[in-house]
Amino acid sequence: MINNAIARRYAKALVQLGSEKDLIDRFSQELKVVSGVFAGNAELRAAFGNPAFTADQKKQIMRDLIARMQCSELVANFLLLLVDKNRVVCLPEIVETYEKLADEQSGVIRPMITTAFALDDSQVNAIKGALEQKTGKKVVPQVKVDQSLIGGVVTQIGDIAYDSSVKTQLARIHDILQKG
């Protein structure tokens, strides 16, 4: 819970800065790359959690990473601030929260569209268009296949699910027949 509050505070500040400078998308890309490097490198994560490394050593490690990733000055300063405040371990949560806040700021939703079979581009675009019309927001869909649905589509937008799968319809019929 504490990490969520911390992540939200840092992410909110960075979204505000990105919005002022019209750099929300660039910040997002840079943060994803840096977070991906941390996620894929256990030694790097361990170094920032290890008290044997001094603050200066941790800053130098971060500077080297920033240089290799060619981060913008603002993201570089943000990452160095995380080192100063000993919050690098919160980076995954900060990036996740940043993405959510940036999407809210930009009027973007990222629904999860689950189908029993793979969709072609025209089908995805049709669903995307319907969702954009319904929500009034830009839709960036994520599509996955779950053959257990048998047929139909389940669309998850945040906490709301639109379930028109055959699996759910069969379950409802089963419940009705059971109740008699």
Curated annotation (Swiss-Prot):
Annotated compartments: Cell inner membrane
Main location: membrane
Keyword Transcription included in the entry's annotation: no
Domain of life: Bacteria
An MF annotation (GO) of this entry: proton-transporting ATP synthase activity, rotational mechanism
Subunit structure: F-type ATPases have 2 components, F(1) - the catalytic core - and F(0) - the membrane proton channel. F(1) has five subunits: alpha(3), beta(3), gamma(1), delta(1), epsilon(1). F(0) has three main subunits: a(1), b(2) and c(10-14). The alpha and beta chains form an alternating ring which encloses part of the gamma chain. F(1) is attached to F(0) by a central stalk formed by the gamma and epsilon chains, while a peripheral stalk is formed by the delta and b chains.
Protein name per its UniProtKB record: ATP synthase subunit delta
Organism: Trichlorobacter lovleyi (strain ATCC BAA-1151 / DSM 17278 / SZ)
